Amino acid sequence: SAYRFSYHEQGSPDKEPTSGHTLIMGRPGSGKSVLSAFLMTQARRAGARVFVFDYRSGMEMAVRANGGRYASLNAGQPTGLNPLWTETDARGTAWLSDWLATLLYRADKPLTPAQTNRIQEVVRQNAQASNPALRNWRDFASLFVSTDDGGDLHQRLLEWTEDGRYGWIFGQSLEDTFSLKGDVVGFDLTGILDSEADKERMAVLSYLFRRVEREIEDRRP
């Protein structure tokens, strides 16, 4: 007989979908990836859209076998990500302001209220730019030069421009070219997850989760 499996708690058709509550645990080599691949393939029978955050390419074959797209993100190599390009509507600017405040945080020198307000102002300027080509990290950083903080915010932003130490993450492309199009999308994050730099991991993962969140919120097929 058929076994009716669901990843979610029971919901209602006239309400928001319930969150997923399925967790697979096991020791190395016990078949977690195989089971995940099987469940993913079965979910596709019902038309589910799948995003795979992969480690050591454990799901690559399953993603490709399901006709999906698969890409790798590696530390030190351009990612094609650029939140300045994508987060330009009302929801996006609110998220981007909070995210940048976290990204630029330093335990030894927390942001002042004036700096936080300045971030919000510049994010709005970025969203309203008449020329989309200005939505790059170097031009974005230049908007902080006039901030009355001794150049502190400007210097912090320069680390994320194309020539900065974190420039490989967001500073190498204008348009956000990291595509989530398709019913099955997988990306290998081994190089990011194995990175010893917490800030790099946080930057990449938090923005990737945001991109997926927007896809779900907007009900993009």
What is each model feature region?
Residues 1-2, 64-68, 75, 82-221:
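P-loop NTPase motor domains
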Residues 2-75:
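Glycine-rich phosphate-binding loop of nucleotide-binding enzymes
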